Amino acid sequence: CTQTFYASLMADTYAEIAQTYPDAKADLLTQVSMFDTLYATSNVTIVPAHTDEGYGDAIIAWTKQKEKKRTFAVYVAELYARGLLPQSVMSVFVKTVADDLLECVRHTKVAQTEEHVDCLVRFMFAVASRVPEVKVHIRAVLSIPKAETPCLNMKSKFKLEDALKL
């Protein structure tokens, strides 16, 4: 949560840097290209049963990964709001997440897919107030009957509904 708190400050700082050093904007586009790797289906940490020997380490890894993804989403939304990310880049991010979300919510319920869906939902929520086109995609997901969305748990569904209010 601390990292997301600083996202707007970091975006403001980057905007100042980009004014002085125009190449910084191009560097930023390279930096945000980690999006595909960060939100890849294979990049999901699952928490084992609390009786598992590696439970403590897994909880730490899971928390760090979740925070990294949440912070990235808030940061790109702040960068976009300041004109540092072009509409085309943000649209690609939103479309990629929305398409993945539409597909994954329909998958058979397994821990990895449900966790991935939660991360995608959190991305949509983080950018919803800055990127209005997100809401069309959210409505599309929410319009799918519950019986057809085994990987969309109630917590994620409520998060999407909350995003529509932003």
Language-model regions, residue ranges each:
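Alpha-helical interaction scaffolds
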Residues: 1-166
